[in-house]
Every structure is written in structure tokens, then in C-alpha cells.
A protein has these predicted regions:
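Short polybasic/polar patches that bind polyanions
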Residues: 48, 80, 108, 131
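Flexible, non-catalytic linker and terminal segments flanking ANL/adenylate-forming cores
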Residues: 1-36
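Structural core segment of the AMP-binding/adenylate-forming
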Residues: 2-9, 109-166
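Short, flexible loop segments at the rims of nucleotide/cofactor-binding pockets, characterized by
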Residues: 31-34, 67, 114-117
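A structural signal for short coil/turn segments at secondary-structure junctions
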Residues: 50-51, 83, 133, 155
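Conserved AMP-binding/adenylate-forming core of the ANL superfamily
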Residues: 35, 52-97, 101-105, 122-127
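AMP-dependent adenylate-forming
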Residues: 16-19, 41-64
């Protein structure tokens, strides 16, 4: 970190006249250094450095960064194979589960835009979000497919992809 980035709140001077709260930060740095690349770029860096570390634990099952990275790349290839291109909007309507994380990063790898929709949203809400976002594809869990089936004729989706929790 540069000297300026290491400045502590206790050293606040006239350089930060519009941030009077910084004097209350104590020894906590108020300038942080952030990764300059993409979200996936940072994950790739972590995969390279710590391939065997646990990326996530879901219902007692641990998944390494190596496997997580392979899953994301496989999903990204599948999205490209069905015609998803950079800039396309993809609705992800899934709960907090590993499939959601994999799909989210795969969408980023492709260069598409993730439109996150809560899976407990009503059919009308999902239809609204699909229209508003201009999504060309939706990804959801099999248990929520009935919501998409009910509105599919009202929206322009080239694909509805189903995942399941095993």
C-alpha cells in the first residue's frame, strides 16, 4: 500500500475536509486498495493460488476452488453453445445455492449481464423483470419451472434452463 493509502483516520487533516467521520475510524485505514480486474479475474487468481482450498460448503459438501472453476468454465461454454453473447441479459431466478454462484460467474465469463430475480417472486413479477431487463434466457431451478411455463408465451426467451439441487 502507498503511504497515502495507509493513512489512518487518526491522521486526518485538511486533505479530507468533507469527511468529518473519518476521525472516528481509529487505526482503521480509510483508503482501501481494490482489485483492478473483473470479478471473474479475481476468482481466477484465487483458483490459481489456492486450487485445493474450499470455495464453498453447501449442506456439508465442500467444493474446492479448482472444481468451482471447472464448473464455471463448463457452464460458460454451454451458455455460449446456445448462443449467449457478450451484452446479452440472462435472468437467474434461483435461491442461494452453488448452482446460482456457478451460473452467475459463467454469465460473467461470457460477458453477458446477470439479471438476478428472487425465485419466490410471483409470476407477474418475474414476467415484469424479464420484460424490463430484455433477458433472452432464464435459468431457474426445476421446482420453479411452473412460473416460467405460465408466462413463457408472454415473453421473448430463447431458452429456459433448469437446474436442480442434488
Amino acid at each position: 500500500m502507498s503511504t497515502e493509502q495507509q493513512t489512518k483516520a487518526s491522521e486526518v487533516s485538511v486533505r479530507e475536509p468533507n469527511a468529518p467521520w473519518l476521525k472516528n475510524y481509529g487505526d482503521i485505514p480509510f483508503h482501501l486498495e481494490y482489485f483492478k480486474g473483473s470479478m471473474w479475474g479475481k476468482v481466477e487468481q484465487i483458483i490459481a493460488q489456492y486450487p485445493d482450498y474450499i470455495a464453498y460448503d453447501f449442506m456439508g459438501k465442500h467444493t474446492s476452488y479448482r472444481k468451482f472453476g471447472r464448473d464455471v468454465e463448463l457452464c460458460a461454454r454451454a451458455l455460449k453453445a446456445i448462443g449467449v453473447r457478450p451484452g446479452d441479459r440472462i435472468t437467474i431466478c434461483m435461491p442461494n445455492c452453488p448452482q446460482t454462484v456457478v451460473v452467475f460467474y459463467a454469465v460473467n465469463v461470457v460477458g453477458a449481464i446477470a439479471n438476478m430475480v428472487h425465485p419466490l417472486s410471483s409470476e407477474n413479477e418475474i414476467e415484469f423483470f424479464l420484460r424490463e431487463s430484455g433477458s433472452i434466457c432464464a435459468i431457474t431451478l426445476d421446482q420453479f419451472y411452473h412460473k416460467f411455463e405460465a408466462i413463457r408465451q408472454n415473453v421473448e426467451l430463447s431458452n429456459v434452463i433448469l437446474a436442480s439441487i442434488k
